């Protein structure tokens, strides 16, 4: 049946093979679209009474979905892979999913907030994805390529809506390297227009000293930009 499907994804699944035997499918790449497509397919499968195998064969046709059971892998004597053979119409190459237009990536702006103190008790908006630095030790800088920025207007609107809808008094501009956003100074100016009178803090994690601008020193939020 279709109960207890085990699905994986995210950075920990960028190399799924060591745990492939324990999963029905993996999402490769970014999940804003592919997870919804798989869930829609699962709804159809349940309504039509598909078997588990039928569902997985259909899911494998969705770009960014890897179904380990649909591939036979043979190895050389030294343990390296000799051949990967797809079965039952599974694609020979699985292409990871990305959001080419980052402004169109789905982002929650109105959700239930916890009624307890939590560690990251603030609104978070993702200002860019990927990184221009290419540090060799950084997994995230490679798996989130290509580098994409959200536009100033979209970030500003998301941050404003999050604070007004959810009651937060702090918003974090999240990314791998926020200070590398090409329009950060313009973004800060626009956000301070509403953040300052409403006493909303602006938090900028992942700053690099070589790309910070004078604006970040001279235009703090009401309780000091961090």
Language model features: what each stretch is:
Residues 1-87:
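Glycine-rich beta-alpha loop elements in corrinoid/cobalamin-binding modules
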Residues 5, 170-172, 199-203:
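Structural preference for beta-strand elements that scaffold enzyme active sites
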Residues 11-12, 142-155, 179-186, 199-216:
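Canonical radical SAM enzyme core domain
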Residues 21-23, 120-125, 136-146, 168-176:
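Glycine- and acidic
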Residues 68, 74, 79-124:
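N-terminal [4Fe-4S]-dependent radical SAM core
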Residues 113-137, 163, 204:
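N-terminal pre-triad scaffold of radical SAM enzymes
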Residues 164-195, 209-212:
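Conserved glycine-rich "GG(E/T)P / GGGxP" loop and the immediately following alpha-helix
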Residues 217-226:
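Single conserved hydrophobic/aromatic residue that forms the stacking wall/gate
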């Amino acid at each position: 049946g279709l109960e207890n499907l085990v699905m994986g994804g995210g950075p920990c699944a960028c190399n799924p093979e060591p745990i492939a035997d324990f999963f029905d499918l993996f999402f490769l790449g970014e999940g804003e679209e592919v997870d919804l497509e798989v869930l829609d397919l699962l709804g159809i499968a349940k309504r039509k009474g598909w078997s588990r195998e039928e569902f997985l064969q259909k899911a494998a046709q969705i770009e960014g979905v890897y179904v380990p059971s649909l591939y036979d892998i043979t190895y050389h004597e030294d343990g390296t892979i000799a051949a990967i053979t797809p079965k039952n119409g599974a694609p020979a190459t699985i292409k990871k999913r990305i959001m080419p237009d980052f402004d169109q990536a789905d982002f929650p702006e109105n959700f239930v907030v916890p009624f307890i103190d939590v560690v990251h008790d603030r609104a978070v908006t993702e200002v860019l994805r990927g990184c221009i630095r290419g540090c060799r030790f950084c997994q995230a800088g490679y798996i989130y390529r290509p580098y994409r920025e959200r536009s100033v207007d979209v970030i500003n609107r998301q941050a404003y809506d999050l604070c007004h809808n959810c009651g937060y008094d702090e918003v974090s501009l999240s990314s791998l390297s926020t200070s590398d956003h090409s329009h950060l100074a313009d973004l800060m100016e626009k956000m301070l227009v509403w953040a300052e009178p409403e006493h909303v803090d602006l938090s900028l994690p992942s700053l690099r000293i070589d790309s910070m601008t004078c604006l970040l020193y001279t235009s703090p939020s009401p309780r000091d930009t961090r």
